From Swiss-Prot:
Record carries keyword Transferase: yes
InterPro entries referenced in this protein's UniProt entry, alphabetically: Class_I_gatase-like (IPR029062), Peptidase_C26 (IPR011697), PuuD-like (IPR044668)
Keywords: Glutamine amidotransferase, Transferase
Organism, as annotated: Lactococcus lactis subsp. lactis (strain IL1403)
GO MF, one annotated term: transferase activity
Cellular component aspect of the GO annotation: cytosol
Pfam short name (any one): Peptidase_C26
Domain of life (superkingdom): Bacteria
Matching PROSITE patterns: GATASE_TYPE_1 (PS51273)
Protein name, entry field: Putative glutamine amidotransferase-like protein YvdE
């Protein structure tokens, strides 16, 4: 059994907050459910002072970076684009420091959506701040289609950590930022039909990340469940 540390998503917008004006750190229940279904324990790690990170890491075996706000373009040397969404510099700093500490402690990391993007930036890569900067014709922000429904195809490298996926696989999609330049030491292991990166890995450092949201589909798509299984069971 592994103890999985999921970095919490800060909810800082108190106006019309469902939490009665309280700031909170939360994660999707589906992240908790999939790991518990696989027999593992989950701890939600709140965004906190960076000096507390090493203490948090003593409590967990692995780290999960989830979705949420856009990654600040200042982290990769760009000014904000007009179509940049909400950013959270405090979360950015905390999660980047957590990535650094987790790598130093040899703790495996799984990134989902924003988590993939932030890992890419950590390793020196850059992002497209908005899909309008690309030539993609795929609807990567699939709303109002429900999140449980896969909507576009990806091609998967069969010699990668995701080699158990069909070579031509369908995923859901809820993002408007994507990788532009790949970070040093990272390998792109899945692409959309538009050529955009959909998954990355660094085998040496036990890093795996996907652009889609397998936590939304694991109950109906057994291949998506297996992503969490191989991560939790230590096969990446």
């Amino acid at each position: 059994m592994a103890i999985i540390g999921i970095l919490g998503t800060p909810y800082n917008t108190v106006e019309q907050s469902p939490f009665w004006w309280n700031k909170v750190s939360y994660t999707r229940q589906s992240f908790i459910d999939v790991f518990q279904d696989l027999g593992h324990t989950v701890i939600i790690l709140p965004v906190d002072k960076t000096e507390n990170i090493k203490n948090y890491l003593t409590l967990v075996d692995k780290i999960v970076l989830t979705g949420g706000a856009d990654v600040s373009p200042y982290l990769y040397g760009e000014e904000p684009n007009a179509k940049l969404g909400t950013t959270d510099p405090i979360r950015d700093r905390f999660e980047l420091a957590t990535i650094k500490a987790a790598l130093e402690a040899n703790k495996p990391i799984l990134g989902v959506c924003r988590g993939l993007q932030l890992l890419n930036v950590y390793f020196g890569g850059r992002l497209y701040q908005d899909l309008s900067q690309t030539s993609s014709q795929i609807k990567h922000l699939q709303s109002p289609t429900p999140q449980e429904i896969p909507t576009h195809h990806i091609s998967v490298e069969q010699e990668s950590a995701l080699g158990f996926l069909p070579e031509n696989y369908m995923v859901n999609s809820f993002h408007h930022q994507v990788i532009k330049d790949l970070g040093q030491g990272l390998t792109a292991i899945a692409h959309g039909n538009d050529g955009l990166v959909e998954a990355i890995e660094n085998k040496e450092k036990h890093v795996l990340a996907v652009q889609w949201h397998p936590e939304c589909t694991w109950e109906t798509e057994h291949f998506d469940k297996k992503i969490f299984e191989i991560f939790a069971n230590g096969t990446i």
